[in-house]
């Protein structure tokens, strides 16, 4: 029931990764990267499909060898989500996966080879209408830039990025996006701010090597949140030392928190105190797991008492306010029913699913009327 965020997004050019539009006002795409051995086709396909199920718009796959390139061909045939091939050092691998229908090439022109090899990759990408992502990382800056700046700085990352951008410009290739990642939040944020002023191409956001599930999510929320709130960013990845599925969930949670893009349920829940009339924490944890399949955008407030419960329920799609033995259920801000506190999880799940179906049907009818 909340309005969209009052964020003015940076204007950028439009590219396509497969069928996913990037930039020029398109929805911010959420992506992750597989962490299986790419040569293990079955495991990689299963992981990609798991990422698809939680809403991944794009998935990146590392392709370090020719054997991995051959595996990529088989993987590509079995999934629907657009795939980005992560290529380093060997330009021939980029040419090979281009033959196999890759949707985007992630390369670092600084380590892909000499001028002629870069030109071959770019010409191939142009011929097959494949976009490129230039990936600059604070941990792998060119040696001369390390010597010039002494350490990774925003100016160093910007210079590295512009060096590669200029390279593609000289080859008359403009179908690319750029990232300037660092594990330090402020280094990454300032680097993206500088880059956003220099180019019109889409920007892929990320705090690289952010950390484990908890610390990495916090770092990413701060860094990406700062940039997104300033209108910077067209795609994003939350890099976690965890199951890649968690990266997608956190990515959407960041976008939901900023009211930029919603997918699924936005749970609003109190941290609990002695006033709670039912098990709020257990209810929220159970419902988050049970309702992962719901992609309908809706706010659900679960508050354990009447102090803040009614107020939150007024601005939620569905809201529960804790009461003695039974708790009040609100729908679109209006009190509708009372739920038994001892059977809260099952009752609330049923109500949420019913509301999601109702909203989906209403949107389907709206679309049909517009199409007429």
UniProtKB/Swiss-Prot annotation:
Query: Which domain of life does the protein's organism represent?
Result: Bacteria
Q: Where is the signal peptide?
A: none
Q: What does this protein do?
A: Converts 2C-methyl-D-erythritol 2,4-cyclodiphosphate (ME-2,4cPP) into 1-hydroxy-2-methyl-2-(E)-butenyl 4-diphosphate.
Q: Which family does it belong to?
A: Belongs to the IspG family.
What SUPFAM superfamilies has UniProt attached to this entry?
Dihydropteroate synthetase-like (SSF51717), Nitrite and sulphite reductase 4Fe-4S domain-like (SSF56014)
Q: In which pathway does it act?
A: Isoprenoid biosynthesis; isopentenyl diphosphate biosynthesis via DXP pathway; isopentenyl diphosphate from 1-deoxy-D-xylulose 5-phosphate: step 5/6
The Swiss-Prot or TrEMBL record lists the needed cofactor(s) as: [4Fe-4S] cluster
UniProt name for this protein: 4-hydroxy-3-methylbut-2-en-1-yl diphosphate synthase (flavodoxin)
Catalysed reaction(s) here are: (2E)-4-hydroxy-3-methylbut-2-enyl diphosphate + oxidized [flavodoxin] + H2O + 2 H(+) = 2-C-methyl-D-erythritol 2,4-cyclic diphosphate + reduced [flavodoxin]
Q: Molecular function terms in GO for this entry?
A: 4 iron, 4 sulfur cluster binding; 4-hydroxy-3-methylbut-2-en-1-yl diphosphate synthase activity (ferredoxin); 4-hydroxy-3-methylbut-2-enyl-diphosphate synthase activity (flavodoxin); iron ion binding
Residues bound to [4Fe-4S] cluster: 270, 273, 305, 312
To which species is this protein native?
A: Escherichia coli O8 (strain IAI1)
Q: What is its EC number?
A: 1.17.7.3
What does the UniProt cofactor note say? Binds 1 [4Fe-4S] cluster.
Name the GO terms of the biological process aspect. Answer: isopentenyl diphosphate biosynthetic process, methylerythritol 4-phosphate pathway; terpenoid biosynthetic process
* Annotated transmembrane regions: none
Keywords carried by this UniProt record: 4Fe-4S, Iron, Iron-sulfur, Isoprene biosynthesis, Metal-binding, Oxidoreductase
């Amino acid at each position: 029931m909340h309005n969209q965020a009052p964020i003015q997004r940076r204007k950028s050019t439009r590219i396509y990764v497969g069928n996913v539009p990037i930039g020029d006002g398109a929805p911010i795409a959420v992506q992750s990267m597989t962490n299986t051995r790419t040569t293990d086709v079955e495991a990689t396909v299963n992981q990609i499909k798991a990422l698809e199920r939680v809403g991944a718009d794009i998935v990146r796959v590392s392709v370090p060898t020719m054997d991995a390139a051959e595996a990529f061909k088989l993987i590509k045939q079995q999934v629907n989500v657009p795939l980005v091939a992560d290529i380093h050092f060997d330009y021939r691998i980029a040419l090979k996966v281009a033959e196999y229908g890759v949707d985007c090439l992630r390369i670092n022109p600084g380590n892909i080879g000499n001028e002629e090899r870069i030109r071959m990759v770019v010409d191939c990408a142009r011929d097959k209408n494949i976009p490129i992502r230039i990936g600059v990382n604070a941990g792998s800056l060119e040696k001369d830039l390390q010597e010039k700046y002494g350490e990774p700085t925003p100016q160093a990352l910007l210079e590295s990025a512009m060096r590669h951008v200029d390279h593609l410009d000289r080859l008359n290739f403009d179908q690319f996006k750029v990232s300037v990642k660092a594990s330090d939040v402020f280094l990454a944020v300032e680097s993206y701010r500088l880059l956003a002023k220099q180019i019109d191409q889409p920007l892929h956001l990320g705090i690289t090597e952010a950390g484990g599930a908890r610390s990495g999510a916090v770092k990413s929320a701060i860094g990406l949140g700062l940039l997104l709130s300033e209108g910077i960013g067209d795609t994003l990845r939350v890099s976690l030392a965890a199951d890649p599925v968690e990266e997608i969930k956190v990515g959407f949670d960041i976008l939901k928190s900023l009211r930029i893009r919603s997918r699924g349920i936005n749970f609003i829940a109190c941290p609990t105190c002695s006033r709670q009339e039912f098990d709020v924490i257990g209810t929220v944890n159970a419902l988050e797991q049970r309702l992962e399949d719901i992609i309908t955008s809706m706010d659900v407030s679960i508050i354990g008492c009447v102090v803040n419960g009614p107020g939150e329920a007024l601005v939620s799609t569905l809201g529960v306010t804790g009461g003695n033995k039974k708790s009040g259920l609100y729908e679109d801000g209006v009190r509708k029913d009372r739920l038994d506190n001892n059977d809260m999880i099952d009752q609330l799940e049923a109500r949420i699913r019913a509301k999601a179906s109702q909203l989906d049907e209403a949107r389907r009818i709206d679309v049909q009327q517009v199409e007429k």
